[in-house]
Swiss-Prot record:
It is found in: Plastid, Chloroplast thylakoid membrane. SUPFAM superfamilies: Photosystem II reaction center protein I, PsbI (SSF161041). Disulfide bonds: none annotated. Belongs to the PsbI family. Keywords: Chloroplast, Membrane, Photosynthesis, Photosystem II, Plastid, Reaction center, Thylakoid, Transmembrane, Transmembrane helix. The lineage of its organism: Eukaryota, Viridiplantae, Chlorophyta, core chlorophytes, Chlorophyceae. The chain crosses the membrane at residues 4-24. GO terms for biological process: photosynthesis. This is Photosystem II reaction center protein I. PSII is composed of 1 copy each of membrane proteins PsbA, PsbB, PsbC, PsbD, PsbE, PsbF, PsbH, PsbI, PsbJ, PsbK, PsbL, PsbM, PsbT, PsbX, PsbY, PsbZ, Psb30/Ycf12, at least 3 peripheral proteins of the oxygen-evolving complex and a large number of cofactors. It forms dimeric complexes. One of the components of the core complex of photosystem II (PSII), required for its stability and/or assembly. PSII is a light-driven water:plastoquinone oxidoreductase that uses light energy to abstract electrons from H(2)O, generating O(2) and a proton gradient subsequently used for ATP formation. It consists of a core antenna complex that captures photons, and an electron transfer chain that converts photonic excitation into a charge separation. Pfam families: PsbI. Disruption phenotype: Able to grow photoautotrophically only in dim light, oxygen evolution is 10-20% of wild-type, reduced accumulation of protein D1 (PsbA).
Length: 37
């Protein structure tokens, strides 16, 4: 059960990091290169 819990926490943390990274990369304030044109 401990291994399953660690696996679940790892997957959840991974998806949360993906969501945060995607949100920041799509934010114009965080990516000034999209505002050049």
């Amino acid at each position: 059960m401990l291994t399953l819990k660690i696996f679940v926490y790892t997957v959840v943390t991974f998806f949360v990091c993906l969501f945060i990274f995607g949100f920041l990369s799509n934010d114009p304030a965080r990516n000034p290169g999209k505002n050049l044109d």
